[in-house]
Design a protein with these regions (language model features):
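N-terminal signal-anchor/signal peptide hydrophobic helix marking the start
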Residues: 1-8
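N-terminal helix-rich module
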Residues: 12, 16-46, 50, 54-140
């Protein structure tokens, strides 16, 4: 009898926890994707300062973006320049991104081609903005 009561309590607890988790997962994925994109943008800014050349971010579609170490500062992808392609949906399946522009970080840490990046999923959307001073900021 005691075993049946314990199993009943455990099944109710599991059911409530499962329901709560299923509503929270999209929110956690969106926040994780925002952290991923923001950290990549800040890292590109820091690399521009350290390496003294332009770092350019190209948003290719609603899930991929490319980080270019533009050695000759021409804004184009040339042979021999390091490229790092990121797929946001590799870790955050239901998150999509849209960008208003392809930003560049200059050797002084400032930015050109200012951009707003919007990340969206079923829990909502968040916006990352890049100011002319190079500040990367998240807005809800």
């Amino acid at each position: 009898m005691e075993l049946i009561i314990v199993l009943g309590i455990m099944s109710i607890t599991f059911m409530l926890t499962n329901t709560w988790l299923s509503t929270q997962l999209p929110h956690w994925r969106l926040n994780g994707a925002v952290r991923q994109v923001m950290s990549d943008l800040v890292a590109a800014k820091m690399n521009a300062v350290v390496e003294r050349n332009r770092q350019r971010i190209f948003f290719q579609d609603n899930r991929h973006y490319l980080i270019l170490d533009d050695k000759n500062n021409n804004g184009q992808i040339d042979a021999g320049e390091h490229q790092d392609v990121r797929d946001i949906q590799a870790d955050y399946q239901d998150v999509t991104l849209t960008a208003s522009n392809n930003p560049s970080f200059l050797p002084r840490g400032t930015a050109s081609n200012l951009a707003s990046i919007i990340l969206t999923n079923s829990s909502g959307s968040k916006k990352i903005t890049i100011s002319i001073t190079g500040r990367v900021k998240v807005q809800s």
